[in-house]
Amino acid sequence: MGQVLPLVTRQGDRIAIVSGLRTPFARQATAFHGIPAVDLGKMVVGELLARSEIPAEVIEQLVFGQVVQMPEAPNIAREIVLGTGMNVHTDAYSVSRACATSFQAVANVVESLMAGTIRAGIAGGADSSSVLPIGVSKKLARVLVDVNKARTMSQRLKLFSRLRLRDLMPVPPAVAEYSTGLRMGDTAEQMAKTYGITREQQDALAHRSHQRAAQAWSDGKLKEEVMTAFIPPYKQLLAEDNNIRGNSSLADFAKLRPAFDRKHGTVTAANSTPLTDGAAAVILMTESRAKELGLVPLGYLRSYAFTAIDVWQDMLLGPAWSTPLALERAGLTMADLTLIDMHEAFAAQTLANIQLLGSERFAREALGRAHATGEVDDSKFNVLGGSIAYGHPFAATGARMITQTLHELRRRGGGFGLVTACAAGGLGAAMVLEAE
């Protein structure tokens, strides 16, 4: 069992989140087609700094993530510093925790703030599913290395003669778990079957997500936290997410065929999050530094937790594992929360985690706890929709959720919010936020 671990520095400062921003999220190969993640990252960080009017030298560290990495820019964080006019002496490094990458980036900046090595930093993430590192076969890669070391033309030709046509085919990024060979959708199908989640339930959650996201845009709730993106060569712009289907009906969802288990499956493209391009970032400071600069924080980070489970069966249970730990460290219960925002990788995964958060048996047998974490109140859950509607640029989603939840907490007069996500590799993340 854990204990209450308040995120307060030795000087008594809380960890303040002073602002957050994201690009609109775009479906793969649409508005951001051809724009690499590093450029999306520069776009959002540059605009975040401009809007905040915080002097660049105030930011002492930038931690950024990218899940689908480009070989030519392996440290996306440093490229963002150099490409946005920030102080060249700003510390910058990159992290990856699959779909929880920007949660990790935030945690790393928080650790620096808690240690006292910095007083302000930026955390975030960017991903592009439209600009991908296309590789070569292992055999071709080995031959190319050997050719580079060959001394004569005859040696080079002999090496190339070993290749067959199939060896020359490009190799796209893997979509399956390295350790198991399972795709994320295969795991979602596992979870639907394990926990008895029907196709109708999944479609209903997906429909709810789109309806609520569309309403959030219609009500103007997202305008402040989503920038307008001007797309090179700057003849077009994108001001809103382009995946949201506000006019869809449940009948539309029912028309789609299963995408993974073709014969007996229930997971479809419509009740899953789509491949997406986008970037998001937040500025964090110690509470006293924010006061010195005359800034009113969006809110504060009260606690966080990361967990890991086995990858072979139902591995997308991160929220069910990490949430009780984050709540315990915050000294709170589910009943104390004003809002709950859970990453919707798949409707099946989301519904399974909701089910297990309220399960006494899961708490006892899996978590070793005496009582269930708590039932999820639908009136508090993903009130503005979730990733199924907005999309999911892997490394950007956590920062989107944090910013979105804090803004909504402030609209409701303050309170506590939980943001939580599953991630590839059986990983989970949860953070408890506070707004006044």
From Swiss-Prot:
Belongs to the thiolase-like superfamily. Thiolase family. Signal peptide: none annotated. Pathway: Lipid metabolism; fatty acid beta-oxidation. Its EC number is 2.3.1.16. PROSITE patterns: THIOLASE_1, THIOLASE_2, THIOLASE_3. One of its GO terms (molecular function) is acetyl-CoA C-acyltransferase activity. Heterotetramer of two alpha chains (FadJ) and two beta chains (FadI). One of its GO terms (cellular component) is cytosol. This is 3-ketoacyl-CoA thiolase. InterPro entries: Ac-CoA_C-AcTrfase_FadI, Thiolase, Thiolase-like, Thiolase_acyl_enz_int_AS, Thiolase_AS, Thiolase_C, Thiolase_CS, Thiolase_N. One of its GO terms (biological process) is fatty acid beta-oxidation.
